[in-house]
């Protein structure tokens, strides 16, 4: 029976590791910045779009653009503001409710200015190739308990759904999990809480 080292665990999940060391050891030093750039380059080579996001407003504007493309619909400003505030960044929603929106309730209602209702997909689960994948890095959040800078985030249709903390060779992977747990506690909820979708 294999035994696994527990890297991180919570009431929702457990991450384990099984490591078989390679006989060949690299003597090359790779900084965390170089590791990050290499990782981004690999994602771009697989079809991800690299974009620069410097503020929460940039993140929100990109989200609107991506949802408009996915749904082949252009929001009027009032429609977008209502949809964004009531569905995407609803202040009453926490991480559980936001996860449910992605996993189960990914089709949301938009009440149009003319009173009609239109379905808006957050994610296309029928044809996953309709979803647009983007990668950003070094996004800074200063509205949390502490100022933070996130290494790499993958956006799916503009929503931050995957967050990656990279560690250079020699640093324990556990440090990355601890850092993400700190972010979840101290900053993912900041601003309009978009990082709670991670």
Segments (PLM) and residue ranges:
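An alpha-helical interface "stripe"
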Residues: 1-198
